[in-house]
């Protein structure tokens, strides 16, 4: 697969002013006035308050050079001046921010949109292009005559104001000290009260706020493209619906949305037993999230087997053109107890797919704050992770015990933590690290990204995140308690393997 170098952008496209119609020939008339150089201005805030001392970079993509830099003042404000049109070519300027200890997400008040965008130029260095994509938040502005950009703002995050709260997995039975059910991390929910039958062919999930088609088998099986179309065209009057919905309101769920239904305490199907769904198959269900394949397209999409909640990764289950999988439909944009994070996928391959809709809380950049003591904070979820990713390795029971006894002085830690404060991540926690625009997350986590002058732009996030390896979660496979759920280090798919197998583990608190 093709790796990508991408970033999240807000594109501000100004409109050219009208011509004056004045003659510029020898018979008279005034020559056109030189266009006023454009300006870019905005504010950086943290929890709604101005954040001073943030370095703001104005990068010109036409020349792949830093055009100018600024530092936010006591009011969190910055201004750039002098953006011009050169000849008939508008200057393309990308603004991004950095301050140690924070991640950022952009917004702009003039109608521009936040979205991810392919970008390679800044990371051309003596080693060539990075092996994996890097995604960071910028405001992209085309400098057209007399069109200043205002309200080019950034919100800062440090983990204490994390926008995402993870849900509990639903595991009820404990199989070992320190496992998922014994620790019970995540937003609690009750299967008996979580779902509401709306008596109109829909079911509302109060945990996520999503509204699901009650008849999970009505749309049947289809190839991926046909499934997307069927979901997009679903409307009241079909599949038992009397909700007044119209075509375009329903969609195929992305991988995070479908995963949110999985109850790891159940099997056949792996859904809460009291959920009022009908005709749920134990087979393989499509998601609208593709494997990243570059801007030209991808031949495969993520699928989940609902008999047990396993992600599928084989040609018979994932190829869009040949695999016939079951389709479910969802609508709504949240409003529940928790907010689901976006998958990170951003390339639109088809109408209604994940790349088009990008549903969920967007990912922040830089996402992780390195505390210099062997720990990292994820600004999206607020979780604190062990930085050294290869320190704990073994069978599931031994890995659990090692994490339970982990303390400062071990595995590169100098944080003052003591035994009992760390835990093995559950299925939802480990999976939350995923960014579905990456084809090899372990590679991305380990890589040093350098600017053209070979200076470091981003140091490795984790230390020695091992490629092509299974990383344990504390969550047991309810369909076979001799197995536990793992997350594969490259694709971040969720797979069950025997607890007697050897695997790596991260630690979290």
Residue ranges and their predicted role:
Residues 1-8:
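Bacterial N-terminal signal peptides that target proteins for export
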Residues 15-18:
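C-terminal motif of bacterial Sec signal peptides marking the signal peptidase cleavage site
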Residues 20-30, 133-251, 255-423, 427-509:
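Glycine-aromatic-enriched surface loops/turns that form tight recognition elements
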Residues 20-39, 45-49:
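Beta-strand-rich domain onsets/edges
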Residues 28-31, 111-143:
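Extracellular beta-sheet/turn segments enriched in Thr/Pro/Gly and aliphatic residues
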Residues 38-40, 46-63, 73:
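Short, ordered, surface-exposed loop/turn motifs in non-cytosolic proteins
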Residues 62-83:
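Short, acidic Ser/Thr/Gly-rich low-complexity loop/linker segments typical of extracellular
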Residues 88-123:
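A short, solvent-exposed loop/turn motif at the edges and junctions
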């Amino acid at each position: 697969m093709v790796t990508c170098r991408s970033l999240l952008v807000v594109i501000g496209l100004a409109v050219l002013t009208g011509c004056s119609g004045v003659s510029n020939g020898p018979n008279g008339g005034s020559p056109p006035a030189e266009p006023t150089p454009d300006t870019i201005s905005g504010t950086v805030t943290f929890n709604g308050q101005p954040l001073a001392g943030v370095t703001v970079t104005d990068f010109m993509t036409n020349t792949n050079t830093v055009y100018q830099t600024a530092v936010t003042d006591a009011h969190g404000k910055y201004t750039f001046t002098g953006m011009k049109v050169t000849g008939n070519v508008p200057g393309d300027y990308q603004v991004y921010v950095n301050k140690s200890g924070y991640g950022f997400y952009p917004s702009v008040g003039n109608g521009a949109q936040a979205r991810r965008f392919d970008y390679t130029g800044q990371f051309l260095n003596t080693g060539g292009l990075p092996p994996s994509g890097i995604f960071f938040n910028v405001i992209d502005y085309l400098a057209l005559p007399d069109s200043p950009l205002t309200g080019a703002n950034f919100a800062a995050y440090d983990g204490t104001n994390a926008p995402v709260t993870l849900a509990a997995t639903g595991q009820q039975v404990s199989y070992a000290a320190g496992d998922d059910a014994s620790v019970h991390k995540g937003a609690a929910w009750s299967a008996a009260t979580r779902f509401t039958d709306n008596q109109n062919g829909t079911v509302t999930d109060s945990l996520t706020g999503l509204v699901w088609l009650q008849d999970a088998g009505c749309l049947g099986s289809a190839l991926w493209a046909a499934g997307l179309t069927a979901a997009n065209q679903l409307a009241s009057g079909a599949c038992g619906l009397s909700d007044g919905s119209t075509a375009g309101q329903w969609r195929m769920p992305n991988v995070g949305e479908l995963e949110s239904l999985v109850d790891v305490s159940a099997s056949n199907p792996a859904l809460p037993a009291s959920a009022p769904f009908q005709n749920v198959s134990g087979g393989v269900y499509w998601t609208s999230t593709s494997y990243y394949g570059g801007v030209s397209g991808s031949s495969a999409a993520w699928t989940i087997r609902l008999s047990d909640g396993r992600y599928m990764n084989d040609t018979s289950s994932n190829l869009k053109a040949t695999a016939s999988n079951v389709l479910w439909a969802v609508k709504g944009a949240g409003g529940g107890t928790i907010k689901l994070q976006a998958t990170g996928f951003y390339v639109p391959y088809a109408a209604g797919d994940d790349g088009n809709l990008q549903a969920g809380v967007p990912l922040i950049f830089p996402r992780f704050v390195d505390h210099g003591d062997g720990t990292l904070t994820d600004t999206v979820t607020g979780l604190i992770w062990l930085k050294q990713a290869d320190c704990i390795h073994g069978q599931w029971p031994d890995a659990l015990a090692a994490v339970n006894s982990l303390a400062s002085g071990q595995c590169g830690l100098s944080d003052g933590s003591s035994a009992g404060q760390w835990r093995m991540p559950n299925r939802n926690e480990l999976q939350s690290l995923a960014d579905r625009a990456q084809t090899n997350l372990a590679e991305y986590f380990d890589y040093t990204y350098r600017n053209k002058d070979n200076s470091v732009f981003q140091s490795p996030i984790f230390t020695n995140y091992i490629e092509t390896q299974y990383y344990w979660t504390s969550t047991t496979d309810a369909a076979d308690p001799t197995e536990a759920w793992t997350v594969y280090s490259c694709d971040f798919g969720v797979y069950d393997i025997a607890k007697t197998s050897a695997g790596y583990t991260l630690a979290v608190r």
